Amino acid sequence: MADVPKREVENVEFVFEVMGSPGEGIDAVDLGDALRALNLNPTLALIEKLGGTKKRNEKKIKLDEFLPIYSQVKKEKEQGCYEDFIECLKLYDKEENGTMMLAELQHALLALGESLDDEQVETLFADCMDPEDDEGFIPYSQFVQRLMSDPVVFD
């Protein structure tokens, strides 16, 4: 099965169970979310290249089609890692004390690179952000740690 270890196949099956319809697979618009739920960080360009779509109900991806995609993304070198994100955010750390302005982080997420929309940023901040201090600064390393931590599975 696309050189994916049994335990990882079980994780993929669980994601398909949660995100898809039995026997039909997942909607191709959810390809990126499925990969991220499996602790991968594919770019939007890679998701599109691998068959992700922008509109719902255009295409379904079955488990046997997804496993080679999962395997390929696991091997992909263009995924951000913790150190990459920290190096990027250090550019905003003018005092070199591990903090940056919340407004600058929000601007970066909304306007730079593969930008997010307002709702995505609000969700991200609610899930991963420490409160800003009186001057509007936040500790960015904890933010990145939470952002990249394994997803919590609720029973």
Curated annotation (Swiss-Prot):
Keywords recorded for this protein, A-Z: Motor protein, Muscle protein, Myosin, Repeat
InterPro entries, per the entry: CALM/Myosin/TropC-like, EF-hand-dom_pair, EF_hand_dom
GO molecular function, one term: calcium ion binding
GO BP: any one term: mesoderm development
GO cellular component, one term: muscle myosin complex
Limits of the EF-hand domain: 7-41, 80-115
UniProt key word Ubl conjugation: no
Subunit structure: Myosin is a hexamer of 2 heavy chains and 4 light chains.
PANTHER family (UniProt xref): MYOSIN LIGHT CHAIN 1, 3, MYOSIN LIGHT CHAIN ALKALI
Protein name: Myosin light chain alkali
